[in-house]
Amino acid sequence: LGDVYKRQSEICSVPEAEKNKTEDYDFTGKRALLAEDNAVNAEVFQGFLKAVNAEVECADNGEAALSRYQNMPDYYYDMIFMDLNMPIMDGYEAAKSIRGSKKPDASDIPILAVTANAMAKDIVKVHEAGMNERITKPVQRELLYQTMEKYIL
């Protein structure tokens, strides 16, 4: 019986290489804006970002994200993560509004769609709204970090 539990423990345990993946990334001094209306998703995402020393500020809808972006100093955020389906203002409209703003970083700041939608038409809409790329839900931590590294390091 002891062997069964030991084997089950080996199968279910997280490999050491997986445990230390965050050590490969350090986003100290980088600040992200996360627009996400689902509190659980926001909490998980914040945990991923904080694990690699990134600062994160949250907005629970597109309008709040747009307001935060517009009311902060120029170049305050290094990246924006945008859920697409939110109340009040969706992520598509928020991204278009950010891109259309008069702030000097409006055309350059990386805006990444965070969505479960993986259809080709959804990807086209993401790019039409001015977003750089799409990260699918559920978010895979390693892919998130690689994408962040691509845009802000």
Can you annotate each of these PLM segments?
Residues 3-153:
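C-terminal compact regulatory domains
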